[in-house]
């Protein structure tokens, strides 16, 4: 859901790791947008064989470096959104450092 991408700062085609809490699989994949307001996360490609509807997932992204190897953005703060079983965001966790 592009709304969720905006909420947590994910970019289209950004590499992410998907930690499947249900079965322990940890595929690396990339982000593709779903329609705003769809409240959906979809795992496609090879990663789709490692997840099932209803699995609990943790999606992790990492910092980026510019052409001068400077960290972008200059200030990084984790932003975590918790999703309920009906795929609604219900809580935000910030600044876990």
Predicted feature descriptions by range:
Residues 2-68, 85-86:
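Compact, glycine-rich, soluble single-domain proteins
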């Amino acid at each position: 859901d592009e709304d969720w991408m905006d909420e947590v700062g994910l970019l289209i085609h950004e590499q992410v790791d998907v930690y499947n809490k249900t079965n322990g699989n940890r595929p690396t994949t990339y982000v593709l947008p779903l329609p705003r307001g769809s409240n959906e996360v979809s795992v496609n490609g090879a990663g789709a064989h490692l997840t099932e509807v209803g699995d609990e997932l943790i999606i992790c992204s990492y910092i980026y470096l510019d052409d001068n190897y400077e960290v972008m953005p200059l200030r990084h703060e984790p932003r975590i959104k918790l999703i309920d079983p009906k795929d609604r965001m219900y809580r935000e966790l910030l600044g876990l450092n």
